[in-house]
């Protein structure tokens, strides 16, 4: 072996020792710090993805609940509408029947009044006719009795 090779080996050993002592630790520290940042970033991304999935599921559940509640409210409104319509229909039928009954009563009353009036007129005409036939005058009291009699018979 010659001295040059030995000098180069010693210089190389010193260079490796110097690098291992002063250069290598900061490089390793920077690499480890970078690895830690990357790992933290990846775990944060995974957590964010999980949180996003959870938020989407929660939003989906809330949307389903809101749709269900809206459907329930619509069904209740339709039931109430039907109930109101049925009540109004029943009230209208009762009012109709009341009006018909009242109209029939008024009609019957008017019919009876007209019938009585007609009876009186017929009785008066009969008395006048009988008076003319007999050509004699009947006193007022006798005429009233005859009219009442005829009215009762009609």
From Swiss-Prot:
Transmembrane spans: 5-27
A single GO cellular-component term on record: proton-transporting ATP synthase complex
Keywords: ATP synthesis, Cell inner membrane, Cell membrane, CF(0), Hydrogen ion transport, Ion transport, Membrane, Transmembrane, Transmembrane helix, Transport
Domain of life: Bacteria
CDD domains associated with the record: ATP-synt_Fo_b (cd06503)
Chief site of localization: membrane
Membrane topology: Single-pass membrane protein
Cellular compartment(s): Cell inner membrane
Keyword Cell membrane: yes
InterPro entries: ATP_synth_B-like_membr_sf (IPR028987), ATP_synth_b/b'su_bac/chlpt (IPR002146), ATP_synth_F0_bsu_bac (IPR005864), ATP_synthase_B_chain (IPR050059)
A single GO molecular function term of this UniProt record: proton-transporting ATP synthase activity, rotational mechanism
Pfam families: ATP-synt_B
Keyword rRNA processing tagged: no
Cited NCBIfam families: ATP_synt_b, PRK05759.1-2, PRK05759.1-4
Assembly notes: F-type ATPases have 2 components, F(1) - the catalytic core - and F(0) - the membrane proton channel. F(1) has five subunits: alpha(3), beta(3), gamma(1), delta(1), epsilon(1). F(0) has three main subunits: a(1), b(2) and c(10-14). The alpha and beta chains form an alternating ring which encloses part of the gamma chain. F(1) is attached to F(0) by a central stalk formed by the gamma and epsilon chains, while a peripheral stalk is formed by the delta and b chains.
Function text: F(1)F(0) ATP synthase produces ATP from ADP in the presence of a proton or sodium gradient. F-type ATPases consist of two structural domains, F(1) containing the extramembraneous catalytic core and F(0) containing the membrane proton channel, linked together by a central stalk and a peripheral stalk. During catalysis, ATP synthesis in the catalytic domain of F(1) is coupled via a rotary mechanism of the central stalk subunits to proton translocation.
Membership in a protein family: Belongs to the ATPase B chain family.
PANTHER family recorded: ATP SYNTHASE SUBUNIT B (PTHR33445:SF1), ATP SYNTHASE SUBUNIT B', CHLOROPLASTIC (PTHR33445)
Protein's name in the database: ATP synthase subunit b
Organism in which the protein naturally occurs: Aliivibrio fischeri (strain ATCC 700601 / ES114)
Designated gene of the protein: atpF
């Amino acid at each position: 072996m010659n001295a040059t090779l030995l000098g180069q080996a010693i210089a190389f050993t010193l260079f490796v020792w110097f690098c291992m002592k002063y250069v290598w630790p900061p490089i390793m520290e920077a690499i480890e710090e970078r690895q830690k940042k990357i790992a933290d970033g990846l775990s944060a991304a995974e957590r964010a993805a999980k949180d996003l999935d959870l938020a989407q599921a929660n939003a989906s559940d809330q949307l389903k609940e809101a749709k269900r509640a809206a459907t329930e409210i619509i069904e209740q409104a339709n039931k109430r509408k039907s109930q109101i319509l049925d009540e109004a229909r029943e009230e209208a039928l009762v009012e109709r029947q009341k009006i018909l009954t009242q109209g029939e009563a008024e009609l019957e009353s008017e019919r009876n009044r007209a019938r009585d009036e007609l009876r009186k007129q017929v009785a008066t005409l009969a008395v006048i006719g009988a008076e003319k036939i007999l050509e004699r005058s009947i006193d007022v009291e006798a005429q009233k009795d005859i009219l009442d009699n005829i009215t009762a018979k009609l």
